[in-house]
Every structure is written in C-alpha cells, then in structure tokens.
Amino acid sequence: MSSSGMPDLPAPLTNIKIQHTKLFINNEWHDSVSGKTFPVFNPATEEKICEVEEADKEDVDKAVKAAREAFQMGSPWRTMDASERGQLIYKLADLIERDRLLLATLESINAGKIFASAYLMDLDYCIKVLRYCAGWADKIQGRTIPVDGEFFSYTRHEPIGVCGQIFPWNAPMILLACKIGPALCCGNTVIVKPAEQTPLTALHVASLIKEAGFPPGVVNIVPGYGPTAGAAISSHMDVDKVAFTGSTEVGKMIQEAAAKSNLKRVTLELGAKNPCIVFADADLDSAVEFAHQGVFTNQGQSCIAASKLFVEETIYDEFVQRSVERAKKYVFGNPLTPGVNHGPQINKAQHNKIMELIESGKKEGAKLECGGGPWGNKGYFIQPTIFSNVTDDMRIAKEEIFGPVQQIMKFKSLDEVIKRANNTYYGLVAGVFTKDLDKAVTVSSALQAGTVWVNCYLAASAQSPAGGFKMSGHGREMGEYGIHEYTEVKTVTMKISEKNS
C-alpha cells in the first residue's frame, strides 16, 4: 500500500486466456439462440481478442424470463433479508478486489485504458460503489404518516422489478458497478447489456456473481448490439425499468421505445458539452492541471470531459502556453506498457469522427497549438490536441468530440461567460475555478448542469448523485438519490377503530 492509501501497482498479467465469452442467463453460460458471435478487438493493436456470443431478441427474452422468475413473490431473492442482500453485494466487491489485477488487465486490453488508471482508479471506484450500495441495502425505509381520520398510513419503498441496464465502452467496470449496485441493493433483478466493443470484464464479473451466491436469474449479462439486444430490452413488455448511459440520440430512441411499450421507468445519462470556467483570480497551476486532466483523461473518452474551456482574457495567453506545455508530455503506446500514459481511441469509427472534428477546427479558423493528427502506424491513437482562438459557433465548440481535444475560449465578464456556458442543449457537469467565494457560489448556481465542481474537476464519488439537465438526460445515479431511482413508493392505509397520538 502506498503512502497515499492506494494499492501498489503490480505488473499487468501476460498471456491472458479469455475464459468467458458466452451469455450469462440464470447463473448459467449460454450460446446465443441464433448461433451468432461477434469479434472483440484490442484498440491498441487492432488485433482480434476473441469471439463473443451475440445476444438477440430471443436471448433477451430468455434473460427477461429468468429475471422475472427470480423476482416472483416467494422467490429466494424476494424473501431474502435486506441485510443478506447487502452481504452478497459486499461479497461481490470482495471478489472483484481479489480479481482486480485480471480485471484491470482485461480493461486495458479490451478498452484501451492505461493499465495504471484501470487498476488504481477504475477498479478502485467500482469496488467503492458496490460497497456503498451494499451498505444501503437494509437502510431503505418508508414512513408512517399522521393522516386525518381513523386511519393508519405508511409507505413502503419496493423494488421496481426487472431492470434493463445498457452502458457504453468508455468505462466498462465503473458503469457496470454504477448500474447493478443500486438496482441490486433495492432488491431488483437485472438484464445487463454491456457495449459490444467491451464485454469482457462484464462477463468475468458474471462468473463472480455466481461465485458470490446470488440466486439464479438475479443478474443476467447479454452482450450484443444496440439495434438488436438493446432495442429488445428497451421495448420489452416485461421489463419494468431501463437505465441507459450513452449518446443523446440513442437515449431518445430508448425513451420512445419505453413509452411505446409498457411505459417503463427510464433513467438516462447522455451526451454533454461541459463548460469549464477559469477566472483570472484562480490558482493558475491548479486550474491548468485540472482542466487538462478533465479533457485528456482516458483519451477524452468521457461524458464528463471538460470539453468547453473558458479562460478570462487577462490570463488567456499564459493559460494556453501552460496547457500546451502540459499536453506535450505524453508518452504514447500500448496501455499495458509501464510509462505509457496515452492510449488509443476505442475503434476506427471513433478515431475517424474525432479526426473529422479536428479538421473542422482547422478549417473554421481555430489556431492549432499542438497535436492535430494521428500517431503511429497501428492502433487508433490521436495526439493530444489543443485549439486556441476558438469561437462559440465552431463545431469543436458545440459538438461532443469524445476525444483528446481541448478548445480554449476567451471571455471578459462573469455575465458573459455564464450566458455562453449555458448556450448548449446539454447540461451534465461544469467546472469553476476562482478564489472568490461569492463568484464561485454565483456561477455554480447559475450554471445549468447536474454537477458543478469548484476548484476541482472529475471529483466523482459513490456518495454524490450524478445526472444531467436538459438533453444530458434525467434521473440520478449514485448517492441516496440514485438508490431511490430503483424503488417504487407504495402507500398503505388501514382503517382502525381508534387513533391516538
């Protein structure tokens, strides 16, 4: 254990044999009904890792049936003490911690994550999320209500039922934990569809679900494509809720499918173009580093990236200079290699999309300060890229890039920057850097975002809720608010012969 409290960093595993490539339904491994599989690739080498069974509508039907049976009244899961539910989630967290090295290595190979980041940050957060949720299992309580008349009234917080959970490829282990943790602690059953690009860690966790002792059907994991498996979950008449993290475009489709089927509950965490505002009175060293990490962590592949950076004009030139110096310090290469701190984008499609947006910045008149092109002859690498002299009407200032591209814009006044920061369809997170407390409170109140970080960035935690305003989605994940997204409140009122205070 290091002096910071983080575990020491071991070497990644070598010559890993992929053990789990089938669908996990009812605590058993299944081939797909269609017999189809799909390839999974290493984005750093472009080499195929393995083939994984491809879930389709028929496989989703099997998973939903298993989840529904596990949720029936009188089932082992429904009759289990809440404290025992919590113990199962604690056990799952312990098993993930035991297999931390394997999971971090898989995350690095399959998702292109820097190994140190996967091991020290992603897996650490995943374990903390599950333990936080485990602690909530026997603390979800209703209320007694002093209603008028000769009645006794109380509320129950009941599990919603069968929950579909769909998430993308940029943080597979974190997203898996943030989905299943709250759902399971409330007593729901789940059908998980990980991204087709990155199913391997979720499938290993499936084996740990069974080892931990969860009853059959409580957790089902069905890798597949969005238009088939994802659509089947969203439109299924026997799924009670769907939680989705991904693009706004797909989020709209999921909400529409939910409405047109059985009006299932929906939680959405969608696209973003997050403003980060640096005032002249900020600690410049700290602001440069936080803003840098905010956009370049995980090669910019983050819905909470600081992708719309506003810097007050009196410090603008120095801020740009320091940011460029920082961005030039990266070491590219295989994410498993010690010392490498900049990995690949997830696939060719994302690589091409990011490069197209970089080219648009050049054409529309932004000043390219560094980067601006691909790196290497193999793998989907893009150089950390910084643009200055960016204006609000440029595509790079308006569209979610999801890559290692920092746009630095200039502002003059507080009122101006608030208006410009809010001039977007999105509202997921924001950052504010200032030593002025009044300014910090004023701006954080005015920004239309579900999370505002002051003098920090990427400071997410299991205890704090996260979610979006506007087209960045609705509902919350994590914290007490996120737990209650997985319950229905039932009111029970009884006639009594006499009521006393």
Swiss-Prot record:
Annotated localization: Cytoplasm
SUPFAM superfamilies: ALDH-like (SSF53720)
Enzyme Commission numbers on file: 1.2.1.3
Signal peptide (from-to): none
Reaction(s) catalysed by this chain's protein: an aldehyde + NAD(+) + H2O = a carboxylate + NADH + 2 H(+)
Chain segments annotated as transmembrane: none
Pfam families for the chain: Aldedh
Site, Transition state stabilizer: residue positions: N170
Annotated Gene3D superfamilies: Aldehyde Dehydrogenase, Chain A, domain 1, Aldehyde Dehydrogenase, Chain A, domain 2
Tissue expression from the record: Eye specific, with very high expression in the lens.
GO cellular component, one term: cytoplasm
One example of a Gene Ontology biological process annotation: ethanol catabolic process
Location of the active site: E269, C303
One Gene Ontology term of the molecular function aspect: NAD binding
Key word Oxidoreductase present: yes
Top-level division of the source organism's lineage: Eukaryota
Record keywords, A-Z: Cytoplasm, NAD, Oxidoreductase
Primary site of residence: cytoplasm
Pathway in which the depicted protein is active: Alcohol metabolism; ethanol degradation; acetate from ethanol: step 2/2
Annotated NAD(+) binding sites: G246, S247, T248, E249, V250, G251
Function comment: Major component of the eye of elephant shrews, which in contrast to other mammals, possesses both a lens- and a non-lens class-1 aldehyde dehydrogenase 1. This eye-specific form is a structural protein of the lens and, in other part of the eye, serves as the major form of ALDH1. Can convert/oxidize retinaldehyde to retinoic acid.
Subunit structure: Homotetramer.
Family: Belongs to the aldehyde dehydrogenase family.
PANTHER family: ALDEHYDE DEHYDROGENASE-RELATED
Name the record gives this protein: Aldehyde dehydrogenase, cytosolic 1
Gene that encodes the chain: ALDH1
